[in-house]
Amino acid sequence: MNPVFNDDLKKLFGGMRYRSVSTYLKDKFGEKTIKLAIDGGFTCPNRDGTKGTGGCIFCSDSGSGEFASDIEDQIRLFSDKWPRAKYLAYFQNHTNTYAPVSELREKYYAVLANPKIEGLVIGTRPDCLSEEVLDLLSEISRTHFLWVELGLQTIHNETARLINRCYDLSVFDDAMRRLSVRGIKAVVHLILGLPGESREEMLDSVRYVSSLPELFGMKLHLLNIVKGSQMEFPYPDYQPFASIEEYVNLVVDCLEIIPPEVTIHRLTGDAPRSILINPPWSFNKRTILNSINDRLNLLDSWQGKRL
């Protein structure tokens, strides 16, 4: 147990009650650091028939990212407000290691040729990390900042089949081990509110991932039902949580069992209002985050308190 919110934790968390990735990056680079969403033009083995078709049931046609645009356009957008900001290029949509290594090399290094880009964030699947791909990522990590994001979503096999994930937990475990051997940082995505999962099952997924010694960061997504996903018609009225309060209480319980050194990359969903179906309150990201912070302060709680 960590019964005291001491000065070391306050410094680690940068004045917050959890270790946000924004705080981590500000400490590392000395300036605000912004991720720029990149669409690399990749597809997914869960869409092209290699593993499945249609993708995971929560994904829209454009994949998990909905905001990708040109790098320079994005930098111009941010530079007026943060003229000294640092930038990471985030290959977000679909599976960004699912291509011949020669193509990956060309696309990754083309982005890194921009002197304003400090490094890469690469979203992918655990079953799309061949030895050749890992060798390329290891090569890049020796000269540039890099982390890899893995979409696990749940540790429960029944839920994994329901969401059409198309790989076993053992594949994820092996990918984490092989990333660790090469010293490549790994961030794991989990979704809160998947159909059929109980509150305790969601917490079990958080506990499992939190126990991995090689874990760098975690994303906790609120399940968003969006237009263009396979959930749009079978689950149009599905509400993953009855209220924002129920969701906030669960997130606080999750944070309390995540080790303090793990970076927190997301605590809610982020679907644009134009495609969001449910839950209707989830488009107001700032309200959700403020409610989480208020709850942590009210309970005098913090990331890792229960460990």
Describe the predicted segments one by one.
Residues 170-229, 245-268:
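Conserved C-terminal portion of the radical SAM core fold
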Residues 56, 112-117, 204-219, 288-303, ...:
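Structural recognition of alpha->loop->beta junctions
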Residues 1-23, 32, 224-307:
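Auxiliary Fe-S-binding modules of radical SAM enzymes
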Residues 34-38, 87-92, 120-122, 146-150, ...:
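Hydrophobic faces of well-ordered beta-strands that scaffold small-molecule active sites
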Residues 1-88:
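N-terminal [4Fe-4S]-dependent radical SAM core
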Residues 78-82, 107-115, 135-145, 177-181, ...:
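Acidic (Asp/Glu)-rich catalytic clusters
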Residues 105-109, 138, 198-216, 244-245, ...:
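Short, electropositive alpha-helical surface patch
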Residues 62-74, 78, 82-101, 116-129, ...:
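Core AdoMet radical
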